[in-house]
A protein has these predicted regions:
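Alpha-helical elements of the RecA-like P-loop NTPase motor core of helicases
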Residues: 30, 82, 158
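Short hydrophobic/aromatic-rich motifs at helix boundaries and adjacent loops
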Residues: 4-5, 35, 103-107, 153-156
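Glycine-rich phosphate/diphosphate-binding loop of Rossmann-like nucleotide-binding domains
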Residues: 133, 137-173
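A broad structural signal for short, well-ordered beta-strand segments within beta-sheet-rich domains
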Residues: 5, 114, 168-169
Length: 173
């Protein structure tokens, strides 16, 4: 743990890891990088990993954009809502969520829902997994007669595996 951090919420998806913290100290950047580096036993410097820090309203606005699907690889991608909820649940279980981050997550989910319901982002129902399946169907004749190898067991793999009558082999280390 980091003494200067009061609350922590980690959002991890297939293409992002975001760490939201609440602290009475103005900047915990160096402490956070040092903690992650020590925890994972890797050296983190500007050339080895891309990271950025946001503070206050910028960080809150960013999570709202993420929750609305407007900051996704696939614009409007709906899976992020469940990923935020699951990350929140994990942080709650670990007792790292307090009043500040609880409010931030709830406001972000509410705002994200409002954006989806009042804009065209809500009309986009495809996930990356379903788009992969659609593209595969276009590229290959009769996909149901083919075997598919999926490396990994992430959320996209789970979506592909759940499709009926398609023979899929999934491997992960």
């Amino acid at each position: 743990s980091i003494d200067s951090i009061d609350e922590c919420f980690i959002l991890s998806t297939c293409n992002r890891v975001e760490i939201y913290v609440s602290s009475k100290v103005k900047s915990v950047d160096a402490e956070l990088i040092k903690f992650i580096s020590n925890f994972h036993k890797v050296k983190i410097d500007n050339s080895s990993i891309t990271y950025q820090f946001m503070y206050g309203k910028d960080a809150a606005y960013h999570l709202i954009k993420v929750a609305s699907g407007s900051d996704s690889m696939l614009l409007g991608e709906p899976q992020i809502v469940n990923q935020i909820k699951e990350s929140y649940k994990i942080a709650s279980t670990a007792q790292t969520i307090g009043k500040s981050l609880h409010k931030l997550v709830q406001v972000s989910l509410f705002a994200g829902k409002k954006v989806r319901s009042e804009t065209s982002l809500g009309n986009r129902v495809d996930s990356i997994g379903s788009l992969v399946l659609k593209l595969s169907n276009k590229l290959f004749d009769n996909l149901r007669e083919r075997s598919i190898l999926i490396l990994g067991t992430g959320e996209i793999s789970q979506i592909l595996i759940s499709k009926p009558k398609i023979y899929i082999h999934s491997f992960s280390n």
